[in-house]
């Protein structure tokens, strides 16, 4: 918590940014410090560690008061109608997010064991990524994960902010629990705080709705539960969790400029844009897809702002200046699009093939509304459709009455179009959805931001109707009237919110929430990566059997890929997939069992000092059997004189490879220069 929140919070407070905004936006700022700072440190050959991170944080914090002194405007009291809660209702306003967090966290914390690795494929890569950052002291996205793809070190651009943050609190042996704390505890806190902040800024005339936004998050098991617990998309989840706070800062900046008066308007805009820009850099560094998300949903809002600004300018300018401004704006938009399309990586994503057709149209449409797959049962489809359509219509009815809320509806529409593009072949929409791998779950998670706002507005309307019915009074449409309702009947509002928490939590079970929670429970068994807790203990303490920094080869789904996260042991393969670019790794994956007949096997083993082999029965993982994906690491004849048994636990065996002639002292496994070139003579472009 301190690493994620403290640097950003102190920096923003030195800029005199409001306390709540500083707390909500702090993670995004910290991510910017980590993301940009790690790149700078790596380019300067300075190691990434706690001391260098502390130095970077101090430098950023010291720069902030200098910036503040040179900008006359400060973030003081607002004229914007944010509708501060009355003192007597602060307990409700603070208590609801806390209650939501408890409901989110309690089931996962009860079920999970922080010391047992997640069974999902991505976490295995991330554990080893943190280990690589710790050992190489490199958290730059332009190199931190270079060693995380097997033997061959290949230039890799990969967001490593998540790994850099975990490395600041972890050590060899504590990578797994440190990763789980960030993924399962800190990310939900960032998410709920950010959504609460966005609610207060986006719904200035609807304090009841603003209070209910965090509550609405319980209706959606997709995030953070599914993405963090089931899928293990931790860097993506970290960036997404901080995104609502950045959006809230954008809305706050716009409101400050519009409602702050003419005095210091330019300075307010300048400083606000700077604060937002750092936040955007932070979430984009944590996961670049977030930048595309913000850009996509902002298209309608940007067009509206540009049109209004141009209209105002054209009215105040001579025709020639107006035309020049129009041309400049159009050129800027074209330049931004051209810059994005100039990247070959972006073009590859846009050109991804679409894996789906036009089957199950009704089920997909309902899932697009509910942001969760609801199955094909007609009764469930009808029920989910009625509930979601009714709630969305009521919420949008409120939105269209307030011009400053239009952006919520437009963002929801834009995200819905992306989801439909991921579900159906819709030409350009499907191409854009390729930036998110046509993965509807990633898009669902973003949609929760806007649906929570819309549903909170709908719930606020319903509470207003009930309050009116109970008091036989006029509906509370204005901000002051809604504030009066909260002030006069805090117990009523709090009770309704508490009841809503219970209802949403129970109703979410219709959406398979028990499945999400169940995935947090440790999995052991013959069909799992870890057969038993005894095998986990064996893997975690391999340095009791073999020398430290020994290198072990084995099927990553046998569990050996977890070894570096628990102790000073290195695994040849650190993720589920053995990549084609890893020529030497493919030789072992396909041919270790041919060690007697293929001289290349011993050549690779000797060159890198790979002295141990971890043997376990193959399992089917993610639909692929290990005996098919890495056939050379199974059915190995260990009685041929090349192997010596070191230890055995629950069917898993650790063998020392002793039969390769001409073994010499191996180079340092973490000297990446020795792993960039092929040791096979002659070099091979592929492995049969």
Show where each model-derived region lies.
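Membrane-interface alpha helices of multi-pass inner-membrane proteins
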Residues: 39, 263-288
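Membrane-helix boundary/interfacial segments in multi-pass membrane proteins
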Residues: 44-51, 115-119, 225-238, 350-379, ...
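Active-site lumenal/periplasmic loops and adjacent helix-entry segments of GT-C-fold
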Residues: 100-241, 261-263, 519-522, 528-529
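Signature aromatic-anchored transmembrane alpha helix within multi-pass, membrane-resident enzymes
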Residues: 326-333, 462-512
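Extracytoplasmic
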Residues: 482, 507-688
